[in-house]
């Protein structure tokens, strides 16, 4: 009788010990994100979170997202420490535009072969994003799936739940003719348009690590973490009558602003009110990208646009800039029955 080799899960490419080592590595940073409403710790089958008692009619708001092919660029450049911030930002910024306070966040990390150092760097970034937005990292899934991903390549996804008072939901229904639009400056391309970014790098033959732009490597501009606006916007909502907020993500100006506009209104954007950050000028020139396409693909230096009554503008700008935002008046809402919901002039 022939002896057969006894196979293990590790022989199949799944290292449970590495997974346990990762959990041990990240416990400390995850604990720092804990909110008082969270019950229990890491390791349970599910995460428990009570609703904050200050809400009379709490409405839960949820969102899920990834970071697109910015992740491919981060992997190629072996820079994993801020991609987790991007992941959180894409989710929590979508929640806060509806007036919601983020409560808790969960992540999904999938890879062909688990590298504990890489995964720890990514999840530490997620924890940092949670700290910046005031939400708890309550759990996640780390999936080692040999044969599904090439080597140590990985993908991440995030899921966030927040809460808003029912009477204070921001849905754009109050937007009206004469409202003023305020812009919040972005930190760069954030997490959108990176398939085009990578194509431009390929066609131009540019090495982002050696190409200098504004005194630092182009890679620093391209991998700058997505700005998290949660705390500034939540304070603004408390003190100013905000009618609508648009998060400029995939689809840029043309697709995201109309999502918060009522019928028979249009947003008129004053292009002279700001200058594009140099990274967008570089992308447009290196890729010979038409201006309309730039506004459809990238945020061009504008991370969020806020609509509010004209009398509130000065107060809003003072508050936002005092909180470290780069905020300015970017346009106005006008009555219109045109199918073109956004005009940039």
Curated annotation (Swiss-Prot):
Entry keyword annotation includes DNA damage: no
Pathway: Purine metabolism; IMP biosynthesis via de novo pathway; 5-amino-1-(5-phospho-D-ribosyl)imidazole from N(2)-formyl-N(1)-(5-phospho-D-ribosyl)glycinamide: step 2/2
Reaction it catalyzes: 2-formamido-N(1)-(5-O-phospho-beta-D-ribosyl)acetamidine + ATP = 5-amino-1-(5-phospho-beta-D-ribosyl)imidazole + ADP + phosphate + H(+)
Gene3D superfamilies: PurM-like C-terminal domain, PurM-like, N-terminal domain
A GO BP annotation: adenine biosynthetic process
Provenance organism: Escherichia coli O127:H6 (strain E2348/69 / EPEC)
Compartment(s): Cytoplasm
MF GO annotations: ATP binding; phosphoribosylamine-glycine ligase activity; phosphoribosylformylglycinamidine cyclo-ligase activity
Keywords for the protein's UniProt record, in alphabetical order: ATP-binding, Cytoplasm, Ligase, Nucleotide-binding, Purine biosynthesis
Highest taxon above the source species: Bacteria
Protein name: Phosphoribosylformylglycinamidine cyclo-ligase
Entry-linked Pfam families: AIRS, AIRS_C
Known EC number: 6.3.3.1
Main location per the UniProt record: cytoplasm
Name of the coding gene: purM
Family: Belongs to the AIR synthase family.
PANTHER family linked to this entry: TRIFUNCTIONAL PURINE BIOSYNTHETIC PROTEIN ADENOSINE-3 (PTHR10520:SF12), TRIFUNCTIONAL PURINE BIOSYNTHETIC PROTEIN ADENOSINE-3-RELATED (PTHR10520)
HAMAP family in UniProt: AIRS
Enzyme class (EC, first level): ligase
UniProt GO cellular component terms: cytosol
Transmembrane intervals: none
């Amino acid at each position: 009788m022939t002896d057969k080799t006894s196979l293990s899960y590790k022989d199949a490419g799944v290292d449970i010990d590495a997974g346990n080592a990762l959990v041990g590595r990240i416990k400390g940073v995850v604990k720092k994100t804990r909110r008082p409403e969270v019950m229990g710790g890491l390791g349970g089958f599910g995460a428990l979170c009570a609703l904050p008692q200050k809400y009379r009619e709490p409405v839960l708001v949820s969102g899920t997202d990834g970071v697109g092919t910015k992740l491919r660029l981060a992997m190629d450049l072996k820079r994993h420490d801020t991609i987790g911030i991007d992941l959180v930002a894409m989710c929590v910024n979508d929640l806060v535009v509806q007036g919601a306070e983020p409560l808790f966040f969960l992540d999904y990390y999938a890879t062909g072969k688990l590298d504990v150092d890489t995964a720890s760097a990514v999840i530490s970034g997620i924890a940092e994003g949670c700290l910046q937005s005031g939400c708890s990292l309550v759990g996640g899934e780390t999936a080692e799936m040999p044969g599904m991903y090439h080597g140590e390549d990985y993908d991440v996804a995030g899921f966030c739940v927040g809460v808003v008072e029912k009477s204070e939901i921001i849905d754009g229904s109050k937007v009206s003719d004469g409202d003023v639009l305020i812009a919040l400056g972005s930190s760069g391309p954030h997490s959108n348009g990176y398939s085009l970014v990578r194509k431009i790098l390929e066609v131009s033959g540019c090495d982002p690590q050696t190409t200098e732009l504004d005194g630092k490597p182009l890679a620093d501009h391209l991998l700058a973490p997505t700005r998290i606006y949660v705390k500034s916007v939540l304070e603004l909502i408390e003190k100013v009558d905000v009618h609508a907020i648009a998060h400029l993500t995939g689809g840029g100006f043309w697709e995201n602003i109309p999502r918060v506009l009522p019928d028979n209104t249009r947003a008129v954007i004053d292009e002279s009110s700001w200058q594009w950050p140099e990274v967008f000028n570089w992308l447009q020139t290196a890729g010979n990208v038409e201006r309309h396409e730039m506004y459809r693909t990238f945020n061009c230096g504008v991370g969020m646009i806020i609509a509010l009554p004209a009398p509130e503008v000065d107060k809003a700008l003072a508050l936002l800039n005092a909180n470290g935002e780069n905020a300015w008046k970017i346009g106005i809402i006008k009555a219109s029955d045109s199918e073109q919901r956004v005009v940039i002039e």
